[in-house]
Amino acid sequence: GEPTLQPELPEFLEKIRDLGYAIKLDTNGTNPGMLKILLHNGILDYVAMDIKNSPRRYAETCGGADILSRVQESVLLLQDSLADYEFRTTVCRPLHTEREMEEIGRWLKEAKRYFLQPFVDSGSLVSGGVQAHTRDELARLRQAVLPYIPNTQLRGI
């Protein structure tokens, strides 16, 4: 689940840090209030944030109309912070096209790093109609983002 929904997260992560461990947060960005606390307190060494789709198709992809504004706030928090971070998108057909990727690129322009990850059908989370992109399609999706985010890479292929 989403770790930033846990109200005790800052205290828990402080205990982990006190043990000498670095802290990486994986988040969907829907709780910018908690992210702001964690960034402000300097608890996080690295943040990996999911970007589900272009702003135009975010609600369609995530099933919530109010999610986008919270995710946009989290994007700005990360881009304005000193924390190291990445954005990442798990791409699949038909949700992610070159148009969507270009829109994401414009939205996240000059992000530190952005990863495209291929969808893998586990059979348990997604109903029918969603398919993985081919390697060539993934390469084209990456090319659509590169003019905006030069450090765009493919992961997991």
Residue ranges: model-predicted function:
Residues G1:
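Short acidic donor-binding/metal-coordinating loop in glycosyltransferase active sites
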Residues T152-I157:
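Acidic carboxylate-rich catalytic motifs and surrounding loops in phosphoryl-/glycosyl-chemistry enzymes
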Residues T4-E137:
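Conserved AdoMet/S-adenosylmethionine-binding subsite of the radical SAM
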